[in-house]
Each structure stands twice: as structure tokens, then as C-alpha cells.
Amino acid sequence: MATLLLLRSLRLHRSLRPRTRPAVDVPLRAGSHGARLLYPDHIPTTPLQKMLLAAGAAGMALYNPYRHDMVAVLGETTGCHTLKFLRDQMKKDPEGAQILQERPRISLSTLDLSKLQSLPEGSLGREYLRFLDVNKVSPDTRAPTRFVDDEELAYVIQRYREVHDMLHTLLGMPTNMLGEVVVKWFEAVQTGLPMCILGALFGPIRLRTQSLQVLFSELIPWAIQNGRRAPCVLNIYYEQRWEQPLTALREELGISPPPKHIQGLA
């Protein structure tokens, strides 16, 4: 309850300021050096406010893992040092550095759905579109970054959110609870973000016994192995690889095919 009250007060405080909201997705960049609002949805917070938000968001996310707003708040208020490490990894990689420079966004306003639909069967773009259709999800459900007090790091965590469904596609995981837990294990190994580690450790609490057996005996070892073997997935410019066969991209990244029986579990 305290977290929700704090969120509401921060939103109210922000709403009293003049604001210009972009009509479409734009790269996250600072408007000027020294400006307190560093990007369009930025809400400056003190260390104490971040601590309170993190504690409350963690509790809410554990109680209801589908509260994506609370998961987002938890990620932004606990991952500063990890985000710096991920940012530095991107800067050292040519493809990652290009992403940081160009700041691409993944949303319905930036995706050419008709082009994706026209791509060959088995291509990354076609399989990503199939994932969205089958699981009835939209890239527009990703919350904007608000509580990261650095515009470059804000983009890094925004990029992580927007490629989350791409990781589902790469790993062949559905959006049920079991699939989400498996992806969280992969992300935890890949990124080290506290919210990913928390989701990986506590997500299994809500799974059935049959799913738990498969998770611990097969899926967690598979996710950890792939997470360690693959290069940083934030360094992949997915939008420039739509035509690449999904199997070829998996092979390039060292990601082995997903277990066949995952779809029947929840």
C-alpha cells in the first residue's frame, strides 16, 4: 500500500510540471545537460524513495508475478550498477554500440507488421510475429522507464524490456508461468539484474508439481547453459536480422533448441 501511495504522489508531482509527450516512440535522450528531467517519462527520486519503491514493488511482484508495472519498478530501482555493466558491454561490441547510438524502439508504431508477415517461414521476423499472435501479447505493453536517473541507462533497461519477447522467441518459450520462469533464469545469467534473479528464484513457487519436476531437472540447467554460452543478447540488433532464419540465429548465439514438451506444461 505504501508503495502505491508513493507512486501516486510521484506521478502527481510530475503531472504538475509542464510536459511534452511524443506522439510516437522516440529514442530516450536527455533534452539538455543539467535538466532534472532527463527523458520524457523520467521521475526523479531520492535514494530513500528508491529503497521504498524497491521494497514495495518486490512484495507486490512476488504476490502477483503478472503485475508487470511492479516488476518494472523493481528493475529500475535496484539495477543501477548492473545497468552500467550492461551499458559498458554494449559499448564494447560493434552491434551493441550501434544500438546505443541509434536507440531503436520496438513497438507497434515502429514495427512493419505487413513486412514481418511477408517474411519466409522460420525467419526471426516471422517467428516473432507468430509468437505475438499465438500468445496474444503486444510490444506496446512494456512500461516506459521512469525511475532511472541516467538517460543512457534508462535506454538500456528500456531495450531489455522491449527485447524480452524476442528472447521468448529465441528460447521457444510460451508466456505461461513456466515459460516466464525459464526466460527469467536465462535473463538472470545473461544480465545479472536483481529483478531477474528474484523472478528466477521465487517464480517457481506458483508452479504445479509436474512443472516443477521438469523445471528443475531439465529447463533450469538448459536455461543456465544457454545463458552462459550466448553472448550478451542486448548486443543483437534484432530489427536488422528479421530475415535471418531463427535456427541460424540460435546457432550463432549458441542457443540449443528448446525441449519439445514445454508447450504442454503451465
From Swiss-Prot:
Pfam families on file: Coq4
Enzyme class (EC, first level): lyase
Keyword terms of this UniProt record: Lyase, Membrane, Metal-binding, Mitochondrion, Mitochondrion inner membrane, Phosphoprotein, Transit peptide, Ubiquinone biosynthesis, Zinc
FT transit peptide: 1-30
Gene Ontology BP annotations: ubiquinone biosynthetic process
Subcellular location, record wording: Mitochondrion inner membrane
Pathway info: Cofactor biosynthesis; ubiquinone biosynthesis
UniProt modified residues of type Phosphoserine: 109
Cofactor(s) essential for the protein: Zn(2+)
Topological category with respect to the lipid bilayer: Peripheral membrane protein
GO molecular function list: 4-hydroxy-3-methoxy-5-polyprenylbenzoate decarboxylase activity; carboxy-lyase activity
InterPro entries reported for this sequence: Coq4, Coq4_euk
Keyword hit for Membrane: yes
Assigned EC number: 4.1.1.130
Catalytic activity of the protein: 4-hydroxy-3-methoxy-5-(all-trans-decaprenyl)benzoate + H(+) = 2-methoxy-6-(all-trans-decaprenyl)phenol + CO2
Entry's Gene Ontology cellular component terms: extrinsic component of mitochondrial inner membrane; mitochondrial inner membrane; mitochondrial matrix; mitochondrion; ubiquinone biosynthesis complex
Binding residue positions for Zn(2+): 164-165, 168, 180
Family according to the record: Belongs to the COQ4 family.
Cited function: Lyase that catalyzes the C1-decarboxylation of 4-hydroxy-3-methoxy-5-(all-trans-decaprenyl)benzoic acid into 2-methoxy-6-(all-trans-decaprenyl)phenol during ubiquinone biosynthesis.
Subunit record text: Component of a multi-subunit COQ enzyme complex, composed of at least COQ3, COQ4, COQ5, COQ6, COQ7 and COQ9.
Protein name: Ubiquinone biosynthesis protein COQ4 homolog, mitochondrial
Organism, scientific name: Mus musculus (Mouse)
High-level lineage: Eukaryota, Metazoa, Chordata, Craniata, Vertebrata
